[in-house]
Amino acid sequence: MISVATLECFTHGKIGIKIHKMACGYKELQNDFGYDIIRGNVLVTASMFLPSKESIESLLNMKLPKSDHEFKYSKAYNEENDLKVAEYISKALKEKLKCNIAISTTAGVGKGAISILTDKNSYLFTSDIYGNLIKGENILKRQENAVNKAFEAFIKILNEEYNIKE
């Protein structure tokens, strides 16, 4: 079994929850893309929604860079720093939970960032949608795009790195 952990911000835990539901065999999803690849091959050890910088630092025993923007209780970086922070988080998550695959997401101003760290490789990419957390622009469109893009990348990784086919 391939173990997966997610620590998500702008995707609100939706990536991990989707993987978990498929891994558990939810019948409502049995016709969805990726179901047969995940079911019986993947287990989710943790799926977290953590917008708070302090909570992430405390849980993963790490220090994140200062936010680029002030935004209520949440961290908010520009796209360049989102990419760095997503990668930091996935590395710390993988180390802390000893999982095969760690997925993290974070987005402030820009397209956001998705990091998928496997036993062999590191994948770092953005959504296709510009959003601005501070101004509330395109937040849900960016989120939906990122969830879909990350899930598709996850399935491709299972195919190519772990040789799991439908």
UniProtKB/Swiss-Prot annotation:
Database matches in InterPro entries: HcgF (IPR009625)
Highest taxon in the source lineage: Archaea
HAMAP family per UniProt: UPF0254
Family listed: Belongs to the UPF0254 family.
Protein name (database record): UPF0254 protein Mevan_0254
Organism for this UniProt entry: Methanococcus vannielii (strain ATCC 35089 / DSM 1224 / JCM 13029 / OCM 148 / SB)
